[in-house]
Amino acid sequence: GTLGTNPEELIAAALVGCFNMKLSFVLNEANFNPDKLDTDALITFEDGKILSIDLNLKGKVPKISADKFVEFANEAKNDCPISSALNCVISVTASLV
């Protein structure tokens, strides 16, 4: 067999893409224009089930406070359509670089 992507990796990629798009939209609506949003996802998979997905976000957004950035990141996580479709715990850790 050849190496390939598994379904869990595709779910993680879909969540990261959706989350970044939603966060970019939320930031732009609040007049913050991100220079960079870099998000990784870590899936906890046990007994054939995705138990949780931890998003690790590093962003560069001029003129935003760290608290406001975390607030917007949580809003994006909660309102992202992919997050809403998944039946697992999703957390986000957001930091400015």
Residue ranges: model-predicted function:
Residues G1-A13, N20-V97:
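Extended beta-strand/beta-hairpin segments
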